[in-house]
Amino acid sequence: MKFKLIIFIIIIYIIKILKSEILNEFGYGLVDENLKCLSFIGDSNNQQLCNNKLINKQLIYSTINKSNQIQSLKMVEQSFKQLTFLQGKCLNLNFAQFGICDIYFPSCVETSFGISLPKRLCKSVCKQIVTDCPTLGVSLNCSDSNKFPTIGTLYNLTKYGYTENNGFYQVECSNPTNYYYNEINSTNNQFIEICPSPLVLRNQSDSKYGEDKGYTYLSPTNCVLGCPQPFFKNNKWVQMYKMSIVLSTLSFICSIYNIITFGLLSKLKSKYNLCITFFSVSTVLMSLMDIVTYGIGYEELLCPESGRYAIQSDVACGVTGAFFHIGITTGVLWWTTMSICLYSEVKRFKMISFRYIIIFNSVISLILLIIPLSGQAFMSGNGSLGCWIRKTWYANGTFWIPCGISLFIGAICIVLVIYEIFKISRNLSKDNKPLMFQIRPFLCVLLVGGSFLYLFIFYFNNERNLDKYKAAIPSYVQCLLSSDENGEDCLTDGPGFGAYFTFYFFTRLFGITSFSIYGTSKIARDIWFESAYNHPFFNPYIVKCLSLLGISKHFSSNSISGSNQKRFNRNGSNFNMKQNKSNPNDSISLSVVESTKKQDTENELESNIETKENRSTDISIENTTSSKDSNTNSF
């Protein structure tokens, strides 16, 4: 008898344990009389979400006005954005999307008591999602049986007259697995990628959206970076746009002035005049890029469509990029030529015929232009103010390496010139006038060369840090995913604004620098005065004004044309113009000093060096230091 009693107690205990275990497989839910079984509100017009991922779209647990569905759509969209950037890290993310849609839009059961109850996602489905993508385990707590029951959810409907199972109404859990595998091959049920603003979704498997078309994809997603790339906030980009067009316009005007002065009006075509003219032509071409870009619109030209930067096949980009490249390449070559000419004058060795230098610089510039053009290397890039070469090997091979070589040659010439000038100054006099005579050419060579050197250093420093910038992209994406301002407060890692601003500042300063040094010189003013005097329209007015003012003015043969000398004497209204014979091979000196009276003549010495092809000019360093050696070249 006792044995039977023990057996009975054990059976009762086991039943209680089993019942307890069974009950543990259920979750408990609250009843909300305000929620009903209604149809799915549907996806928004421009974004597919759960429309094809719900088991039963006609019975969704929802408020009467469906306001909770609107909020749920926002939550699903945010979840899909995060899943987009988990590609490559997780398996079967499409299945996770089915599960997420089921969580936010649970299926609904209508009871005979007029109460609507939701179906919760099965724990097995939750565990499968987390197993495929452990990262989601942070937001999905599969051990919570109230949210993810193993069998179903129990709802207490006692007060509604339900008496079975002690008043607990059982609703089985939702398992979309079978539905998922039935729909997996449907074209409407593929994994949905959503890119957070300002990233743009493109299909990179489509050739028209390939990277070579101007798209920068954030692998392994189909999201592309915005254009321009958010290195800085919008107001900073506006500052750079304004700086760019203002400096480029001024540089363009200054360069045109130099071309007219030293290339067209000046009667003497010396090598320094030619260097200044060709260098000014190069800065005109560089400035045209910004002027054309501004005319079209910076963002319109550089970013022709959302998420795409301009490439060479975009005509405006190809043309402006070619202008800028041949301009800056030619500028580097002519700067180097000026450095070599400066050194040749100091050392007094004869250079090759200048026509060969012109041919050499022109041919090299064209070759360095044709190579990137043939490789479709011109593009605006994600963060730039204009189109230029963006492919690394083309950029290095057709500009930066030649630029480095030119900078090296020019730097050597500068150092040697400084050494020679100091040596001459020390040997001839304690006076520093020989050095002061070279102030303008030194300024030109040093300032322009220093600008090119900064560009060189900035570029390669930027290239060196590219991996660091790329490594910071995930942080930028994470910022976008958590941003409440459409990503406007998020920035990618890149060059500092100051360094970036300075880089573009220097590339637009060359024309202004050249004008400040040469265009404002005494000789430039005299060239314009002589040209105006020789013009039949202006001549009578100039003669009359000089006569009325009683001005005596003298044009040195070395300071203007090298072939004539004009003297204006104070003789009331009488005006004399006196020809002075001089060797036609005499060259114009671009070194400027103040005029000094010597008997009847005022000799003007410009601060640029001018070579003599066959014999010395009338003014020399020895003249300055009272030496009588007439064969010494002028500095």
UniProtKB/Swiss-Prot annotation:
The keyword Ligase does not apply. Residues 623-635 have a biased composition (Low complexity). Residues 559-594 have a biased composition (Polar residues). Glycans are attached at N65, N141, N156, N185, N203, N382, N396. Residues 594-623 form a coiled coil. The chain crosses the membrane at residues 245-265, 276-296, 315-335, 357-377, 399-419, 441-461, 497-517. Residues 32-166 form the FZ domain. Disulfide bonds join C37-C108, C50-C101. One of its GO terms (molecular function) is transmembrane signaling receptor activity. Residues 1-20 form the signal peptide. Residues 21-244, 297-314, 378-398, 462-496 are extracellular. It is a multi-pass membrane protein. Residues 266-275, 336-356, 420-440, 518-635 are cytoplasmic. One of its GO terms (biological process) is cell surface receptor signaling pathway. It is found in: Membrane. Belongs to the G-protein coupled receptor Fz/Smo family. This is Frizzled and smoothened-like protein C. It comes from Dictyostelium discoideum. The lineage of its organism: Eukaryota, Amoebozoa, Evosea, Eumycetozoa, Dictyostelia. The gene is fslC.
